[in-house]
């Protein structure tokens, strides 16, 4: 009995049909790149200080000294959330007293920004922060905005697979594109922060659903050899292209509503893709819609210039194939033995902390020295060589060492940021980008590594659980950025330390390179450096002489 890949092998691997599907599905990911990171500019916090109304009768000297100073990054700057009590300094101004000469400013009573704030417009003309004053006592709302977007991403990752299984890959792909584009457009008309945030969470649901379904559709249509290229370089590289486009839009459009409109419009260009992207033949077969699946393959063969067999799918053969029942599995199977539980816990930590590093570095771009638009572009650009490097390393080297190696690289250079003199800002930016390179490379390898560690029976569940852990990491990441308001170096110290720590933990994983994928839980390799309880002589013999074939990658 042949499987699906054997049935359609006559199509070849890289004909016009496969190239069309590869590039169209990859291109559909571009809006995900700029929508996913748009919060960097939509919720940017410009320099600000308390507003001193023009109606207050102050001399020019007292107006210039109405804001207390504080030391920040080694220089004196006006405080962002405090001012001298206006009634007091107005009296001093009326008496003709001079600040700093007749009055000791350090002894003056201070008050909060009772009349609002004035914001610098050097970088942003308007953001949701300036529109709804998400600063000082309300500055906690800014990271929460981003976290709730990723909560939407987490929810979307739950439902996207189930929806595509029920209604089909193609319909759900375009429906979730519509959700992402439509609700992004509705966000433009937000009247308050609460409305914006709820809509942003829905956009997050649409964004990840679009990504996941495009990923599934590509892996089901493309052949095995192209499937790896699509999942590692295709979708990831086009996501990075969208990421790089974002700062170009933001540079020329500095009003958040107009920027959001500009980022929404490209989603309309995905509409014509409906007539070029087919439904997944695999899904159609699973729904017993054999004729529709055969029509798609016939069109693909015609596009590739290949003569297709008269009958491609034998209903009896496929019915027999679909009738095979898999053993039911439960989440507790990932913790069935001490060894499996250890691998699962370490995998969850690896995914979550790597995700924290990736998203914290991406979202922390506004806090870097220099031009925020250039830094954001570089942050997206550095991902392209990171993905290519990961792809090349996965082809030739053991998984544990390459993942640990790039994590050590990323964490190490992030820890070096704290020793760079303040005058060498370009060095700090370079180190941060090198750190992003390492973390991004590691992140892109995790799907392959996790899939190779677990047996077929629980592989999808394991990847799903660890992927959920990465969503939790993305929810936490904005608060690492938030710590930068207290100390500019603190996020890098924490991210660098955690990245090095998870790199060390990676060395305790079993190696999966060149090893046949396990088919059941008993074939899973043992964690290195851990004792998994007492073993019988028989079980010890099995571990010393495992029945696992070593194959070339």
Curated annotation (Swiss-Prot):
Q: What else is known?
A: Mediates the Na(+)-independent and pH-dependent bidirectional transport of xenobiotic tetraethylammonium (TEA).
| Chemical reaction(s) catalysed | ergothioneine(out) + Na(+)(out) = ergothioneine(in) + Na(+)(in); acetylcholine(in) = acetylcholine(out); glycine betaine(out) + Na(+)(out) = glycine betaine(in) + Na(+)(in)
Q: Which PROSITE patterns match?
A: MFS (PS50850), SUGAR_TRANSPORT_1 (PS00216)
Q: In which tissues is it expressed?
A: Expressed in intestine, liver and kidney. Weakly expressed in brain, thymus, lung, spleen, heart and skin. In brain, it is expressed in cerebellum, especially in the granular layer, in hippocampus and cortex. In kidney, it is expressed in cortex and medulla with relatively more abundance in the cortical-medullary junction. In heart, it is expressed in myocardium and valves. Expressed labyrinthine zone of the placenta. Expressed in Sertoli cells in testis.
Q: What's the main place this protein lives? A: membrane
Please explain the role this protein plays, according to its UniProt record: Transporter that mediates the transport of endogenous and microbial zwitterions and organic cations. Functions as a Na(+)-dependent and pH-dependent high affinity microbial symporter of potent food-derived antioxidant ergothioeine. Transports one sodium ion with one ergothioeine molecule. Involved in the absorption of ergothioneine from the luminal/apical side of the small intestine and renal tubular cells, and into non-parenchymal liver cells, thereby contributing to maintain steady-state ergothioneine level in the body.
Activity control: Allosterically activated by intracellular ATP.
Cite a single GO MF annotation. amino acid transmembrane transporter activity
- Its protein name is Solute carrier family 22 member 4
Membrane as UniProt keyword: yes
For this record, the Gene Ontology CC terms, alphabetical, are: apical plasma membrane; basal plasma membrane; mitochondrial membrane; mitochondrion; neuronal cell body
Q: Which residues lie on this side of the membrane: Cytoplasmic?
A: 1-20, 164-171, 219-232, 279-339, 395-400, 450-462, 510-553
**Is Ribosomal protein found in the keyword set?**
no
Could you tell me which species this protein originates from?
A: Rattus norvegicus (Rat)
Record-annotated membrane-spanning stretches: 21-41, 143-163, 172-192, 198-218, 233-253, 258-278, 340-360, 374-394, 401-421, 429-449, 463-483, 489-509
Description of how the protein assembles with itself and partners: Interacts with PDZK1.
Share the entry's pH-dependence remark: Optimum pH is 8.5 for ergothioneine uptake and transport efficiency decreased at more acidic pHs.
Q: Where found, per UniProt? A: Apical cell membrane; Basal cell membrane; Mitochondrion membrane
**Which residues does the record list as glycosylated?**
57, 64, 91
Q: Where, in this chain's numbering, is ATP bound? A: 218-225
The family this protein is said to belong to: Belongs to the major facilitator (TC 2.A.1) superfamily. Organic cation transporter (TC 2.A.1.19) family.
């Amino acid at each position: 009995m042949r499987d699906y890949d054997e049935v359609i092998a006559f199509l070849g691997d890289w004909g016009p049909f496969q190239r069309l599907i590869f590039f169209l599905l990859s291109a559909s990911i571009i809006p995900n790149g700029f929508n996913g990171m748009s919060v960097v500019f939509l919720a940017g916090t410009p320099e600000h200080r308390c507003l001193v109304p023009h109606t207050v009768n102050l001399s020019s000297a007292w107006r210039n000294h109405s804001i207390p100073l504080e030391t920040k990054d080694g220089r004196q700057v006006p405080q962002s959330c405090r001012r001298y009590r206006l009634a007091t300094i107005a009296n001093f101004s009326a008496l003709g007293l001079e600040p700093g000469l007749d009055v000791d400013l350090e002894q003056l009573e201070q008050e909060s920004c009772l009349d609002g704030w004035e914001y610098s417009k050097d970088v942003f003309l308007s953001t949701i922060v300036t529109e709804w004053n998400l600063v000082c006592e309300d500055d906690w709302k800014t990271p929460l905005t981003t976290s709730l977007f990723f909560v939407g991403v987490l929810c979307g990752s739950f439902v996207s697979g189930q929806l595509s299984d029920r209604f089909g890959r193609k319909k759900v792909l375009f429906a979730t594109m519509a959700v992402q584009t439509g609700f992004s457009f509705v966000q433009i008309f937000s009247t308050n922060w609460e409305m914006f945030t709820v809509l942003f969470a829905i956009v997050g649901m649409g964004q990840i659903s679009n990504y996941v379904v495009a990923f599934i559709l590509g892996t089901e249509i493309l052949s095995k050899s192209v499937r790896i290229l699509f999942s590692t370089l295709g979708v990831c590289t086009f996501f990075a292209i969208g990421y790089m486009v974002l700062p170009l839009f933001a540079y020329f459009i500095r009003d958040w509503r107009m920027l959001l409109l500009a980022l929404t419009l490209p989603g309309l260009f995905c509409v014509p893709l409906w007539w070029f992207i087919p439904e997944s033949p695999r899904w159609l077969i699973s729904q017993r819609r054999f004729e529709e699946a055969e029509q798609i393959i016939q069109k693909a063969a015609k596009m590739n210039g290949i003569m297709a067999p008269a009958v491609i799918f034998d209903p009896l053969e496929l019915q027999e194939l679909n009738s095979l029942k898999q053993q039911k599995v439960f989440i507790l199977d990932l913790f069935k033995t001490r060894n499996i539980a250890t691998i699962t816990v370490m995998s969850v930590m690896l995914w979550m902390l790597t995700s924290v590093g990736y998203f914290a570095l991406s979202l922390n771009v506004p806090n870097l020295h220099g031009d925020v638009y250039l830094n954001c572009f570089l942050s997206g650009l550095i991902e392209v060589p990171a993905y290519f490097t990961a792809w090349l390393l996965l082809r030739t080297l053991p998984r544990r060492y390459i993942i640990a190696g790039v994590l050590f690289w990323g964490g190490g250079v992030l820890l070096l940021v704290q020793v760079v003199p303040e005058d060498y800002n370009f060095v700090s930016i370079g180190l941060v980008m090198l750190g992003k390179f390492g973390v991004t490379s590691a992140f892109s390898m995790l799907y392959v590594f996790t899939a190779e560690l677990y047996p077929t029976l629980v592989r999808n569940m394991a990847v799903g659980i660890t992927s959920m852990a990465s969503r939790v990491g993305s929810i936490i990441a904005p608060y690492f950025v938030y710590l930068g308001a207290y100390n500019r170096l603190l996020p890098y110290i924490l991210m660098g330390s955690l990245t090095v720590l998870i790199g060390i933990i990676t060395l305790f994983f079993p190696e999966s390179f060149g090893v046949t994928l396990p088919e059941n839980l008993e074939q899973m390799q043992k964690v290195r450096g851990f004792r998994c309880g007492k073993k019988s002589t028989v079980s010890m013999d099995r571990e010393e002489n495992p029945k696992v074939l070593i194959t070339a990658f």
